[in-house]
């Protein structure tokens, strides 16, 4: 980064700091009361400044015995002993101010087993609020684990308690939070000042976790008419001399009127401050429009869904992603856009203008200078932003005996999937939903139904996956039955996707019958007559011919008998030749044998020289022999 750029950045930072310090100068210290019950001679009531960490016992009180950590024991290190009083009461530990963070003192006190910690001021001054330390790895290890109440007491009161303990007196105190928050009527009004930046580390994570965890409580209170919740977002404005600078342009909308710090504190990388302001404005408009539609509690759904689906960490923090969340929750997008207006216009935005005015405290209400800040009945909440701790504070804001049931029961459950399916995907036809109700709210997660896993984002899509997917609503694919015939675009041979069956065309989600006759894709042979049918076609040939579908041709049905005649003639000719050959063979064989016999006999019977005549017949012997052999 160049020196010029560094200088401009520093100048802008200082200018913004002066603006903030000039506007936000009045911080209200929220208090509890501390009463000395024993010794009776010391009975009196004092104020204590509630710490902005731990868990104040709003609406209640604590009576305990006091112990002192000791001179020079600042509680900056773990105590090597536990503090046990003489009587079976909770222990209230006094620790001197100084040397380390307030929260670390209270943490070490909590580790030693005490029920509450009072930090004794070492300066004679008005009470101040003990705040959490700056974000650091060391502080983050214990700050969220603080579960006990703590407060700062003034220098004079602390010395009074120490002197009594030094004399061996048993000191019993009552710390009372019952009047720490106003409780005028049967409805509690509370506000949460936050922002949409999810890249600011543990503090941003704390805010988002609170919204997710408190959503169930908040929606029950809002739907029942027990509370009136309003979200708020801190913005600054750019000094007039810097409006045209690149820094102001990257951090502000509406010509420098509404600004937020760069989330990465790097003007050349990642998201800009104006992206934060723009989403802050959208979330304000979501609440405004939802409230006009008597659905103000939907703000909690939008914020949690936006964080899940459109986070900066996943590089999805965008207008397009936000609008998809709006539509999934059934909110009128056009009205929200109208509420947002044009962020580039050189005009005031009425919504953000009102936010800047509310940041400045009026009357008994202090300025909003810390994020997050929770305000209950116009008084700032002190303590960690945790579901049960905040619920207890809100419940303490009801007029006595008007508390709703949620304040009287430790268990709470609401089925958020019953309304608009929780903004999740659902298939009404097969009664399958991605909405799962949990104690902390609902989640959108594709289900497993009858052994079939659905896959998708759970918000806009879930599709059955695997070999058995067609058993559930045909895998989400097209399917239709006509005249006893059923066709489907789902195939169990494929683990996903839809494909129209033969005879149909489309994307698988919708399929239409193909008119093979009209498209001339079949039955185009000579003499063929084509008739379209649902899922196929019928082709008939003229005359006595038969249609062959694979070859798209017709053949003669009588052709089989005509074809056999030549074969028969040939076979008959072959048979005749065989018979004739056999007869000729027999004749030739006999003639050959006769000649052979005659030749043999002629050697032994000279027939010509002995040509005698038989007296009985008148024939010669030679003639008789020939007749005999020929017989």
Swiss-Prot record:
Its taxonomic placement starts with: Eukaryota, Viridiplantae, Streptophyta, Embryophyta, Tracheophyta
UniProt cross-references to SUPFAM superfamilies, sorted A to Z: PA domain
Q: From the UniProt record, which GO molecular function terms apply?
A: calcium ion binding
Q: Which Gene3D superfamilies match?
A: 3.50.30.30, Laminin
Q: What is this protein called?
A: Vacuolar-sorting receptor 6
Major location (coarse): membrane
Q: CDD domains from the xrefs?
A: EGF_CA
Where in this protein does the record put region Disordered?
A: 610-631
